[in-house]
Amino acid sequence: MVAQEQLVLLLMLLAGCRGGANAILDPGWVIPSKVEQLIGGDFNLSCTLNEDYFNGKSAEDCPVEKLYFTGGGRVYRDSKHIRILNNTTILFSDTNAVEQENDYHCMCDEYVINKSKVYVGTRPLLVRDFNCLDYDFQFMVCNFTQPPNTVITKYNISYNTNNDWRYSNTLDCNFDSAPVVTCNLTDDNYKRFSETFYFRLSISNALGHETQPITINHFERLVPARPGQNLTLLNRTESSVCLSWEMPRRSNYNRGLVWQVRVTPQNFEPITRPSWRNHTLTIKDTLCLTELPFAGYNYTLRVRVRANQNNTLWSEPMIYAFATAPAPPRRPPRVTYGSFYVYSSEKAMRFYWEPLEEHELNGPDFRYSISEYRINGTAVDPGLIKVESNSAMIDHWSMSAVHHFLIRSSNSQGLSVNATPMTIGPISNRDFKVREPRNIRSVYHPTNKSYTLSWDPPSDQRELQNYTVFWCVPKPGLQSECEGSIRFAEVASGLHHFTTSPDQLLTLHMAVSANYQSHNTGLHWAICSSDKKDDLAKMEPSIDVATSTSLTVSWSERVCAVILAGYNLTYCQRSAGRPDNCTTVTIDRYTNKHVIQNLVPYTDYSVKMLMYSDSRVSKYSDELVNRTGEAAPSQPRELQLIRVTSDSVELAWKPPLLANGVVRAYEGTFRSLHDNVTDTFRVSASADELVNNEKPITYRLGNLTAFTKYEISVRARTVYPSEPSNVILFSTAIGVPSPPQLYVINNPDQSSRLDWEPPRTPAGRIDFYEISLRDNNASCLTSTILPGRNLSYVMATPRCTSHNPFQLAVRAINVEQHPQLNGADAAEGAVLLMSTNGKGCEARTDALGEEERLQFEAYAANMTAYRLYRSDWGIYGFICTPDTHSVKAMYQTIEVTVAILVLGVIFYLVYKKYRKMSDIGLVLPQGIMETMKKPIDMGGLGLGLGPDSSVSGGIVCTRVDDSPPYTPQDLPHDFSSCGSESSKLLLRTASSSGGGGCVDRDGYDDNHETGPISAVGPPTSYLAMRHGLLVQNDRERERERDREQEREREQQQQQRESEMDREQSCTNGYIKPTQMKSWGGNGPSDNDHTFSVPSTAMTAPMSQPLSQIPLSGYVPVPIPQSRFNPAPVQPFGSPAVPSAATAAAASTFFPPAHLLNMDNYVQASDLHKLKPLVAAPLSQTGGPAFAGSSPATSPPLQLPPVHAASPAAATPKMADIGYTTMEQLQLTGLIKPPLAATVGSPTHAAGGAPGGGNQHSRLQPQINGYVTPQDLNAMAHNRHVL
C-alpha cells in the first residue's frame, strides 16, 4: 500500500512538472502516454487535471468526480476501474488485458482531457516465410511477412557467407509495404558466386527480443534473365521458323541451363515437340520450331530458362508472336446431299457448303470460287453465280435441269488442288408434296442451351436413305439465309429428331432434308418452337414500351401456333409491394404482342404469361414488374386570395388529388386586365405534399402594378402540366406612382409655367399633385398642393443668379383609406408617411378648392386612417430667371481659376529666383582689390580714417548727384533681407571697365578747377571708403540705439511730412538693397550729426550736419543695354548745368515712372530688369547748350563746377555696364523736388555762385532698411560736398 502511494505521488509529481510546461495547451495529463503490455497483463493510467488551465473558470466546470476513461469501445466509470486519488487526479486500472491497439481518453463529460496509446500484444514472433531471389547474378532481393503483433516490433537483418558472425553486413530493408518487408542486397559486399548465405534476424519490441538464423542456398534461388535479348528471325517456312537471341551471362551458370519451349497456335492448345531443342553457343542461342501444323497461321512462342540444378526457379518467359509462311488452301469446302434451298418462287436456288475453319485458310485474301458450272452437261459461265462466304445463289434456276458445280478454296497463294463437286437433279411438284419432311419443329432446352429438331417423315418413304439436319445463326428477318457458317449432320432414316451440342446461341435456325436415292427437295427450315406432345415451355415475355396508361408486352414463339389454343396474360396493380386488383386477358395463338390499356399513370404493375393447348397448360412466366409513365396531374384545388397589397398578392391552394407522377412544380399564369399582358410564375413543389395533399400551399406573387386588376390561375406539373385551377380576379391596392415628367417655360415677368405628364404608372387615382420650389441643396422654399386633374401650373419664381440657382419639381400623390391598420400594415404605413418628410416646408393648399382643401387636410391630419403615397420628384434642373449670363459666368469662372493658377506658378518661380540670387557672395575684381590696397586719406571726414589708419579695404563706386528732398516716413525700414547680387554686379562693373570707374572718380575729386561743362549729363562721382567701414562695432550698436530713440521722438513729424510728400509727388520708389551694412565711425563727436569736409574747390571749409549714412547700401546695378558714360572730367571750365538735350536724353533712357512709384517696390537686384529707352543724341558743345537750356529743364539740384578734359572727350563712350545713378532717378521724375530747406544751397541753381561760404543744409535720411531715391541723392550730395 505504501509502495502504491509512493507511485501515485511520483505520478502526480511528473504530472505537475509536465503541467508547468504545457499549462497553456492541455487541460490535463494522462500518464503514461503510451502503454505496452503482454496479453493478460495489467496496466494503470492516471489522469490529472491542470488547475492552471481552469483558473478563472467556475469550479463546477470539471471536478474530479466527473472524470472517467473511454477506450476500446467501452466507457469506464465504475469503481472497479476508476479510483479518485485527490481533488485533481484519478487512477484507471485494467486487469487481464486482451490484445488491442487503442486510444484511452480521459474524459470530463463530453470533453477530452488527454489520451494515452495502449498496445497489448506478445513478445517478438519468428518469421515464417523469409525468402531470397538472385536475379541473374546482378542483385538479391529478400522479403518476408511480419507476424501480426499489436506491439511495435523492430527487425534488424545481417548476413555473411562463411557463418563467421565476427564479420557480417547489414541488410537494407523497406517497411513501407508492411506487413510485407522487402530487403535489397546490391552493394559491394554482395558475394555473387557464393553458394550459401547466412542471415540473422534480430527481432525486438518492448516485451522481449528474439534472434532467428536463416540459411539460403544461393544457387537454388538464382533466377536467370528473361531470354530473347536481340531476338532475330533467321528463317520461316509454311511449317517452321528459326530464331536466334543473345544471353550475355550464360558463362556464370557453371552447371548449365534448362530450357522450356511452348508453342501455341491461335485458338488451340499448346503443342510440344521432342525435336525442339535449343542449340546453345557461347553467347547466342538458336531455336528452330519445326513440324508446325498450319501454314499462314498465327502462333505464340513462350521460352523460359532456369539453372541446371534442383529446386531452381524459372526466369520470366520470353513471349514472341509469329506466323508461318502462307500456302494455298489444302482442301475445298465440304458439301452434303440436300444442302440447297429452293425459294417459294421456284426460280431461285441457294446451295450451301461448310466453310473452312480459320486455321485452314493458309493465308490472306481467302475466298470461295466456282471453278466449273454445267447445266445438263453444258458448261456455263461461273460468273452467273453469286458467291458468298457460305453459300451461292442462282437467280435463274430451272427445276427441270441438272446443275453441276465444282467448288474450290483460294487465297493469295492460289486455288486449292482439289475441288468439291455438287450436283442438283431435277425437282418436280410431286416431290415437294410427298418427299419433304412434315411438321418440322425445334425445342430449346434452356438448361444446357441446346436445341432439339423434330419432324414427321415424308409421305413417300420409298428410296429414302437418310436425313440431313442443318443449323446456323439466321440473318435478321431472313429465315432461309444464315449468318456465318452452316453446320450439318446426317440422321438415319428411322430417326425423326436431332439434338445439338450444348451451349448454342439463343437464336438458332435449324432445317432438315430428306435424302432419296435419285431425288432430293433440299432443306426445309423449322417454323415451330415446340410440339404438341412436348411439354409447353415456360414463356419469357418482355415489356417493350411503357406509357402513362399502357404497357406493351411481347414474346417469342417457342412452339408452333397450330398446336396452341392461346395465351393467358395476367397484370396486377401493385400497392405496398404486393399484387392487387389483377386482370387476366386471353390472347390469340397467332399473336406475339399485346398492349394493356387504361392503366393508372405512374403506378407499378406486374405482368406474367402462360401458353395453353388443348391438353396442357404451361407454367406462368417469371413476373415482370414495371411502372407506367407519368401523366398530367389533376388540377390544383381551391385557389384563393389571402392578402393583397399594392405590389403583391398572397395566394393559397391545395395540391391535386391525383398526382399521376411526381409533382415537380406549380406554374401560375396571371394577366393584367389593364394592358392585357400575361406573365407566369413557378413554385417548386415539396415532398410534404405527397404525404398530406390537404395542406394548403401558399405563395407570395410580387412585382405587381398597383391599382390594377388581374386574373390568375395555377397549374400543377409533373412531366406534363395539369388543367388550370379555378380563376380568381383581384385588384392590387393603391401604391406609389411613378414621377411625372416636368416641362418648364420661363416667362419674362419672373414667373414660370409648369406642365407635366401624368405618371406612366399612376398606381392609383392621382388625387393630388405637389409643386415645389427648391434651392441648390434641394431644400424646399415653397410647396403647393394641386388637384389631381391639373397638369399645368403658373407660379412666381424669384430672380436667381449663378450663385443662387433653384429647382422646380412636381410629384404625384395617391390617397388610400385604411380604417384599421395594425401590425405590418401600420409599420409600412408609418414608413411611407415618414419617407415623405425631409428637408421641406409646409405645403400650401390655397390652389385647392374648398372641398379638396378640407379633404387634403383631413388626409394629412389622420395618418392612421389614411395612407398617402407620394411619388419621386420630377425635377426640372437648375434654372435662373433670366438666365442670359450663365454661359458667360461659367467662362469667367474658368478664366479666374486659370489666372490664379498662372500667378501661383509665376510667384513660385520668382521666389525660387530670389532665393537663388540672395545666396550670391561678394567677390571683388582684382583691379578693385589693387586699388583698395592704396592708402587713401579720409581724415577729412572726421571718422579717423586717414592715411595712417590700419583699416584696409576696397572702394565702392557710386554716382553722385544733387540730393532730392525726402521724408523719413517714405522709408519702410527693413534690413532683414540679405543677398549678394550687388557684389556680383560690382564684379561685373570692375571686370568690364578694367577699373576705369575709380580712375574717373579720382579725376573728378582731385581736379575741382572751374571750367565749362560739356553737354553730356552730370558726371559720375565716387565715394571712397575703407573696407572697415562695412564692419559694425560696439559704438555703432550704441548709435543704433540712439537712432531708435530719436526715431520715436520724430514719429509725429515724420507722419506729417510723409503726407506732404505724397501730395507733392507720387513717384517715390523704394530700392531694397540686397545687402546693407551699418555705418561705422571712430567714435562719438561733439555733434553726432555734423562733420567738416575739406574741399579743394572752395577757399573755406564747409561744415554741414550729416546723418549716419550706410554708404554700402548703394549698390551697382547692371544695365542690360549699353548707355552713354559721362564725359571725362575737364581740368578747367566754368560752372554749367545740364542742357535741355542732356535732360531729354536722360529722360528717354529710363522707363516710365510708374515702375518705381509708392506702390511698386523694386529690389536693387531687380533694377537691371528696367529696359533702357533709346537715348537722344547729346550736344558736343557745352556753352550753348547750357545757355539754351531753360530753367524749367534744369535739374532741381546742380553739381559743383567741373572742368572739361579735352574737346576729344566730348565724344560719349559706350559701355556695357553702368550704375543706377541719381540723374537716372531725377530725370525720370522718380525723386521728389527739393524741400524749402535745401533751396539756396551751393548746389542749387539759384545759389551756385562761388561764394560758397554758406553752410549747406545736409539731408539726413533715416536708413533702416529700404533706400529711396532721396536717400541716394543725399548720399551723392554729401559726396559732392566732400
Swiss-Prot record:
Residues 989-1092, 1238-1258 are annotated as: Disordered. Residues 999-1009, 1033-1064 have a biased composition (Basic and acidic residues). The modification Phosphoserine is found at residue 976. The gene is dome. This is Cytokine receptor. Residues 911-1282 are cytoplasmic. Undergoes lysosomal degradation. It comes from the Eukaryota. GO terms for biological process: blastoderm segmentation; border follicle cell migration; cell surface receptor signaling pathway via JAK-STAT; compound eye morphogenesis; cytokine-mediated signaling pathway; defense response to Gram-negative bacterium; determination of digestive tract left/right asymmetry; hindgut morphogenesis. Residues 24-889 are extracellular. The keyword Lyase does not apply. Interacts with wdp; the interaction promotes internalization of dome and its subsequent lysosomal degradation; thereby reducing JAK/STAT signaling. Critical for epithelial morphogenesis during oogenesis; border cell migration. Required in the germarium for the polarization of follicle cells during encapsulation of germline cells. Required for embryonic segmentation and trachea specification. Essential receptor molecule for upd and JAK/STAT signaling during oogenesis. Its main location: membrane. Pfam families: fn3. Residues 1-23 form the signal peptide.
